[in-house]
A protein has these predicted regions:
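Structural signature of FAD isoalloxazine-binding scaffolds in flavoprotein oxidoreductases
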Residues: 36-37, 42-48, 75-93, 141-172, ...
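Phosphate/pyrophosphate- and phosphate-bearing ligand-binding catalytic cores of soluble enzymes
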Residues: 22-23, 74, 161-283, 287-288, ...
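Short, basic and Ser/Thr-rich N-terminal targeting/leader segments
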Residues: 61, 68-70, 154, 225-226, ...
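Gly/Ser/Thr-rich helix-start
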Residues: 37-38, 70-72, 81-84, 109, ...
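A generic local secondary-structure boundary/capping motif
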Residues: 73-74, 115-118, 126-130, 143-150, ...
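Core subunits and conserved enzymes of cellular information-processing
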Residues: 105, 130, 138-142, 147-148, ...
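Anion-binding (especially nucleotide phosphate/pyrophosphate-binding) glycine-rich loop
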Residues: 5-136
Length: 307
């Protein structure tokens, strides 16, 4: 669909729903890589009802949709995104205690705010996630993890909008949580809220562990440069960063993209990188590691648009 048509349809829908939107918006402002072309329109739903209405309007008018959270695990084409970007973020971020050990939150809440809420309520179980840059929905979608913990340990239920635009939920084993994967990775459903079961603990102990993990992140990861976190999934029996370093790729650059000199498992935007630079470097690293080690690395990063 032509950009003007897309913008006009989605804009009218957003205005009826009193939802924020941005026209011809640069995706570099909405991704942690700080790259990518423009989107025809970005709309910010603030409820399940508004999200469903936007999706319904786009479907009826054959408008392609892209669902994003904090944009911390995506690489957007330099050509931009033709269609509607639906950002589930701070407008979609209510949080509350369901009981003394259970948090229920909307999927757009940042992991930082979720972890802070757990700390405020002396709830342990999310210490591993302190410093993860994405949203709670994004973390559930990929079963995010670090430092011996993962969402699988605390996530007990997700509410979603399915491909027929009906509201439903998955619980327990239905969530299909495994390494960097969930049932939502493949089913096309959109997570709208999460239920997490945690444990009461000493607030100071929780805080100490959170900041210990944050310190490890700062020491070992190139947080001073734009990136999407760990670029590759850990291959069974190996560590991606070690394989890349053994292939002498630490510091290797294509355009403004570089394999981090601090941690080879991170591809970073060293300065003025394009998405094409980053995608080309990711491919080069994958092929080089495969040629030298016989292991094909699987990207954690999702690619949106045409590459």
């Amino acid at each position: 669909m032509k950009g003007d048509y897309v913008t006009d349809i989605v804009k009218k829908t957003a205005e009826k729903l009193n939802c924020r939107y941005l026209e011809n918006a640069s995706m570099r402002d909405f991704t942690s890589f700080k790259t990518g072309g423009n989107a025809d329109i970005i709309v910010f739903p603030d409820s399940i009802a508004s999200l469903t209405a936007i999706l319904k309007s786009c479907r009826e008018n054959e408008i392609k949709t892209y669902i994003i959270g904090n944009g911390s695990n995506i690489l957007v084409s330099d050509n931009g995104l033709f269609g509607a970007v639906i950002k589930i973020g701070s407008d979609f971020s209510n949080i509350e205690l369901a009981d003394e050990n259970t948090i229920v939150c909307e999927s757009g809440i940042s992991m930082a705010k979720l972890c802070s809420f757990a700390l405020e309520n002396s709830l342990s179980g999310l210490e591993f996630a302190f410093g993860i840059p994405g949203t709670a929905g994004g973390a559930a979608f990929m079963n995010a993890g670090a430092y011996g913990g993962e969402m699988k340990d605390v996530l007990v239920e997700c509410t979603h909008i399915d491909t027929d635009l009906n509201v439903g939920k998955l619980t327990g084993d239905e969530l299909g949580l495994s390494y960097r994967k969930s049932a939502y990775s493949d089913n096309g459903y959109i997570i709208t809220s999460l239920k997490l079961r945690l444990e009461k603990s000493d607030k100071e102990s929780i805080k100490a562990k959170m900041y210990e993990n944050l310190g490890k992140r700062k020491d070992k990861q190139p947080l001073e440069f734009p990136s999407a976190g760990s670029t590759f999934k850990r291959p069974e029996g190996y560590f991606a960063g070690a394989l890349i370093e053994e292939c002498a790729l630490k510091g290797y650059s294509i355009g403004g993209a570089q394999v981090s000199e601090k941690h080879a498992g991170f591809v970073i935007n060293k300065g003025n990188a394009t998405s094409t630079d980053i995608a080309t470097l990711i491919d080069y690293v994958r092929n080089t590691v495969y040629d030298n080690k016989g292991v094909m690395l699987d990207p954690e990063v999702r690619f949106l648009g045409e590459f």
